[in-house]
Amino acid sequence: MKLLNYALVYRRFLLVVFTILVFLPLPLIIRTKEAQCAYILFVIAIFWITEALPLSITALLPGLMFPMFGIMRSSQVASAYFKDFHLLLIGVICLATSIEKWNLHKRIALRMVMMVGVNPAWLTLGFMSSTAFLSMWLSNTSTAAMVMPIVEAVAQQIISAEAEAEATQMTYFNESAAHGLDIDETVIGQETNEKKEKTKPAPGSSHDKGKVSRKMETEKNAVTGAKYRSRKDHMMCKLMCLSVAYSSTIGGLTTITGTSTNLIFSEHFNTRYPDCRCLNFGSWFLFSFPVALILLLLSWIWLQWLYLGFDFKMFKCGKTKTLKEKACAKVIKQEYEKLGPMRYQEIVTLVIFIVMALLWFSRDPGFVTGWSVLFSEYPGYVTDSTVALVAGILFFLIPAKKVTKMTSAGEIIAFDYTPLITWKEFQSFMPWDIAILVGGGFALADGCQVSGLSNWIGSKLSPLGSLPVWLIILISSLIVTSLTEVASNPATITILFPILSPLAEAIQVNPLQILLPSTLCTSFAFLLPVANPPNAIVFSYGHLKVIDMVKAGLGVNILGVAVVMLGMFTWIEPMFNLHEYPSWASNFVNQTMP
């Protein structure tokens, strides 16, 4: 028993040693570069999945192991750790820092909820819409962390409003009973006594049933706990929590910068296929926005049905509000009024945000000529990261308040220059662990390419070409969706990209046809609290059990894969000419052939 306790305490250390030793015969027996790289890939993949070491520390292992096995020089590996992705990430984090510092995100969320209304069904959709919109530009984690306190306050206010409404109704009922119609006993005389005898409640009558129902209600309150008056209140809290968790993830699908998974895929893809210039901010938004919108609406309906039942009365849009809805609207309005009028800092941040989004969309939209033609002498030199860096630098240049202080007479008495954000504030928001993790993924992909492991995997997967393309896409999507529940999303896409790309090349299918659905499905971590940070944040509020998230998440996972499959064979296929094997993929295969 003592030995088992020691094993549990040192389980991470034992797992690291065990993994290294178990796969060690592979490079010792099969002395090829492919086998040596496969050994490194297996070790890193297991460390990422189990998190035996921190993800960012595991991401540094290629810098240690590739030179030791003679696959890549140390200087070559080091150059893979900083790419165009990191410049884009820096610019986006500058924007996110300013948005959160000046509370612009809270103003946007509350305003969107106020626009939608406070009817329970529409309120949930309002929270989901605002959360998804914010998640397009901020990290999923920070979005969920910001919206959840508002949702919690609204939920508690709804519960207290219902209690107040019931208390009011009960008071009114008691007063009505006490001041009922006066009956002239002299007129009805003996009939009154006869009626009393006739109306004496019998066992099982409605009077007894009322007592039983009140007793059951009391027991129900005891079961559901002091926080909830009834099971319905508990279900409503679960619904709101899950709606925030899932919508923060769904919103991140919409833009390249919405989640680290999209950024990692974009950089990997552009590095592997530099001749393909079809993926940019605008094209990504055009194909992914319908996917996210459909999935958001279906998830809303699914969660409504699962926790509150599906009743068309819930979707009414009448002007008459119940006491509960009025209380809910009051809370949201009070939260919004606390922010005060829109400040100078919020306006500047909003303007930079809008300009940056417009520049991203218009750089090279595809259906019209973008502003990138201004740099036609250097095609491909200007990317989305260029826009992000320009915007990011502006946050360090534009002052957050008036530069000078004056007396009432108009004399300048002091100069005070503070930018919208400072370097320390930026550092506190910058996800350095993700930056290192992505760099490790790039280094791992380069090692697989240099060693020939990617080509070897592709040759072994070529028999899958006999299967229908839709079945290959479905299988890969289901595998990714399952794996991302137990491994982090960035680790999942980093591990699978070097496998799925050679698969597409081997069976002569447009790589985007397999990689796009797999990338979207990598974000479908809806089942477990540990699957992604937004799930963990909403789980920490204590309204949910693991089984609640599993039941709801399973339905959203199925809906997600179905919507992605629908999109791949409808609007996405003509956008990227997925039915043709592109020349840029052929060029890559020819370049890597010995």
Swiss-Prot record:
Q: Which GO terms describe its biological process?
A: sulfate transmembrane transport
The protein's name: Solute carrier family 13 member 1
Residue spans with biased composition (Basic and acidic residues)?
192-220
According to the UniProt entry, its GO molecular function terms are: monoatomic anion:sodium symporter activity; secondary active sulfate transmembrane transporter activity; sodium:sulfate symporter activity
**InterPro entries (UniProt xref):** Na/sul_symport_CS (IPR031312), SLC13A/DASS (IPR001898)
Q: Which residues are glycosylated?
A: 174, 590
Q: Which residues form a coiled coil?
A: none
Instruction: Output the superkingdom of the source species.
Output: Eukaryota
Q: Species name for this entry?
A: Mus musculus (Mouse)
What is its biological role?
Answer: Sodium:sulfate symporter that mediates sulfate reabsorption in the kidney and small intestine. Can also mediate the transport of selenate and thiosulfate.
Cellular component, GO annotation: apical plasma membrane; plasma membrane
Transmembrane regions listed in the UniProt entry: 13-33, 40-60, 77-97, 113-133, 134-154, 239-259, 283-303, 347-367, 380-400, 461-481, 487-507, 511-531, 552-572
